[in-house]
Amino acid sequence: MNEQFANGPDEKPRILIVDNNSRYARSARVLLDRSGKYIACTVIDPRRALETARSFKPDLVLVDLIMPQEDGPEVAAQLEADWALHGVPIVFFTSLITAEEAKDGRRVYGHRILPKPASNSELFELVEQNLPCCTEA
């Protein structure tokens, strides 16, 4: 893969998953890692998302919309306010919408939404659609 990513031209895209549901976060990470196309990292406590993102340097962030300590929009606002992370695409995932609603282009605070749980193909499709390498023409 010779696409341009934040971490270098030959490195796999990095995806940060922020979700207080450790089972869902782990399954998404394992799925992305096992594809061989991505490097994924999970954060279970959303209050650690900014710190982890600064060190992990993601190319894409997947954030649960509703979490008890901080919700997805709060996490997104922190990431967007950080000069090193500003511009990194953020996608929310939630069980509050259906796959059909997500495909209709619904957005929350300007960010795409992925239904939770999503099928493997839905997850991979959304990742590819939102990685900087794949959206630039």
List each model region and its residues.
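Two-component/phosphorelay signaling modules centered on CheY-like receiver
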Residues: S22-C41
